[in-house]
Amino acid sequence: MIIRSPEPEVKIVVDRDPIKTSFEAWARPGHFSRTIAKGPDTTTWIWNLHADAHDFDSHTSDLEEISRKVFSAHFGQLSIIFLWLSGMYFHGARFSNYEAWLSDPTHIRPSAQVVWPIVGQEILNGDVGGGFRGIQITSGFFQIWRASGITSELQLYCTAIGALVFAALMLFAGWFHYHKAAPKLAWFQDVESMLNHHLAGLLGLGSLSWAGHQIHVSLPINQFLDAGVDPKEIPLPHEFILNRDLLAQLYPSFAEGATPFFTLNWSKYAEFLTFRGGLDPITGGLWLSDIAHHHLAIAILFLIAGHMYRTNWGIGHGLKDILEAHKGPFTGQGHKGLYEILTTSWHAQLALNLAMLGSLTIVVAHHMYSMPPYPYLATDYGTQLSLFTHHMWIGGFLIVGAAAHAAIFMVRDYDPTTRYNDLLDRVLRHRDAIISHLNWACIFLGFHSFGLYIHNDTMSALGRPQDMFSDTAIQLQPIFAQWVQNTHALAPVATAPGATTGTSLAWGGGELVAVGGKVALLPIPLGTADFLVHHIHAFTIHVTVLILLKGVLFARSSRLIPDKANLGFRFPCDGPGRGGTCQVSAWDHVFLGLFWMYNSISVVIFHFSWKMQSDVWGSISDQGVVTHITGGNFAQSSITINGWLRDFLWAQASQVIQSYGSSLSAYGLFFLGAHFVWAFSLMFLFSGRGYWQELIESIVWAHNKLKVAPATQPRALSIVQGRAVGVTHYLLGGIATTWAFFLARIIAVG
């Protein structure tokens, strides 16, 4: 038994009026840095200003002040998010065909952007059905609005105004908690209280209120919409909330109120809290009653979780105790010291959060198509493709960000004198073994995955199809993936006796779901083609991890540069006279990691786009015959590199290349322009700084001759600045090219 002295009561502490509100600093660019505040001598000044403006660590070493700045900045971020959301809702209210779409979501396509005729751009306003002309949107907002029970554009206006009010409130909060009542450091470090409030408040009460909204507002309104009732005839949300009889007409058990809850007769509520599984055949989305049930269950879990941590009352878990008890037989001190790291280094904390949030975002991408949550989402192929692509990119960026901040933690916040024989120290001590093994795995995966394709290209070129790896010749079936699919398809009767259908139709087993003559989802077959491309996924992901992990583990020191920590997070080379030491900073690893992240995600979204068009998406005839968009060509075409180039990139680019003169022509222009942005990046990535400095000198000479030379000396970009500009344009150009290619294609054929 552990006997503890009574814990001191947690006091909520703030400093009153710590920093005077003043706009004077705004008039002094770079006021946060003594060097930058002096003003520009050379053009490098503007780059340093942007690089350091939000690097709060470089402004002060006072952790409390840094914490307050970060906290305040978060409110600013939330304000921008509310402003953006308000804009989305305002467009839905002012420029959209939402009410028309609501009346016929299978034939009318969503649009919430109408182009003004200035020099002929009105060609972009395509006919989306129902007599409306505008740009087809693929964000999924219409589907979310229908699911949440919004039936008129007036409601969208009101929500837009509400979001503006919240944006203003967030701006105020950011000012208030920095200038008027700024929390002390102890408040930011009180993890138990933070966990309780975030778990019970944000996630618990948040889910509970959403479940309440879904039960009292969404479910009845969607019942009426599904039955074909005119949206204008449906009672308004507050009528359902205030008038129980209205709900009781749809769900008789509502008449009994909360009695079944308190008498533990919960099965009464099974009318609107269901456990069906599968998709609603009318809308092609998950059953709304399943979703409400899910949020209620999640709310209860998080409300319990939000009461688990020890604060003012001496009961519950302490994070420090949990971490320090975390010792294995082979892990030395285990997690001892991790608590101190995570409460004093916000970079370490952020790295963990970004890694988890990035992984979660990628999980979301995969669930949006396999378990489409909103009505009429599954048959809106443009939106499905956009949501998958968007969440994959975001997840990739967040994971690279995790490595970036882990490396910054290693350089700025890691104290090797206090860390001995804990898990982090042990990982660092055998980093050579980790990195060399990971490198071997990358080489193995690269040669073998690519080698299978090269073999197929060669056999195909030599006219020997019988010697190729394919479903019709030498089969390489993904037996483990098929086993996972099959296990889940059989679950409803076996391991999940309460469920009537599997979690996702993609597992197999069920009949396909079609809405309005279009396939929503069907069992997705996996074969040799998927086996091949999945090993390319394994390869690209492992290389990305290799680069990023090497950057973190060698951020402070390496055999090549033992004193790397003294050089900082980003530096070009280890000074003159030391050749071969460029591109070794932790920043450079993030820079290189971004390119491989881009490789990884590109292959994933290409695979998804082609696989869905080939094997899932398509139309269904009255006789039940399914015609897929690309007629099932994935299995035979994607097993060679040539097939990817010819039958995916080239064949499916025809829509964007031929879009001129049509309502899709903006995508054609973006396709061209984004290629240009991408190519522009190469000028920065393949350039020598000296080349540009020489050029600048002669241009300055000409300006001096004409007596028009500026006072600020022009300088070529530093090596790091050039790389930053290069990778930004590379990713921006590449992503925008893909976006134009995907959307022109899927809007034309989907």
UniProtKB/Swiss-Prot annotation:
GO terms for biological process: photosynthesis. P700 is a chlorophyll a/chlorophyll a' dimer, A0 is one or more chlorophyll a, A1 is one or both phylloquinones and FX is a shared 4Fe-4S iron-sulfur center. GO terms for cellular component: chloroplast thylakoid membrane; photosystem I. It catalyses: reduced [plastocyanin] + hnu + oxidized [2Fe-2S]-[ferredoxin] = oxidized [plastocyanin] + reduced [2Fe-2S]-[ferredoxin]. Its EC number is 1.97.1.12. Chlorophyll a' binds at residue 675. The PsaA/B heterodimer binds the P700 chlorophyll special pair and subsequent electron acceptors. PSI consists of a core antenna complex that captures photons, and an electron transfer chain that converts photonic excitation into a charge separation. The eukaryotic PSI reaction center is composed of at least 11 subunits. PANTHER family: OUTER MEMBRANE PROTEIN, OMPA-RELATED, PHOTOSYSTEM I P700 CHLOROPHYLL A APOPROTEIN A1-RELATED. This is Photosystem I P700 chlorophyll a apoprotein A1. The lineage of its organism: Eukaryota, Viridiplantae, Streptophyta, Embryophyta, Tracheophyta.
